């Protein structure tokens, strides 16, 4: 199996700084709450922000918290743009195992995000190079990512970038380890 993966490109430091902050939490619920706090603050401070969103088991609790806050009237996603991290090649977006479906089930169908502002790699485009270029252009056209949510897999993979992969910039395809396929 192969997945299209976007790795944010470094931009001029005057334009954007990249900060990685490790926050220790006592458990999954605490992590979900704290991560939702960070995302909520970003949406409130910059209503037209670009969120880089992840899939898999890690963010489900985060998305539940964001939906709760939306339902309570605390968050407005109407101006938010999303650029998702990855998608399985060969799966149409309507397939229940696609990450398009995952994101709709867990977040998009429950908040007021504009469907025109939802971006994921196209898993049905079998011209991998063209799809990677197209998705990089989408990300450039929205001004880059303001906040990127990532999960770390049980084997250390991040956004389908396996531990042994070279850290290339931009959207690219990777071959997934069997363990990653089974876990996802």
Which residues are covered by each model-predicted region?
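Class I SAM-dependent methyltransferase SAM-binding "motif I" and its flanking Rossmann-like core
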Residues: 159-184
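Glycine-rich N-terminal segment of FAD-binding domains in flavoprotein oxidoreductases
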Residues: 45-71
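N-terminal glycine-/serine-/threonine-rich phosphate-binding loop
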Residues: 18-51, 129
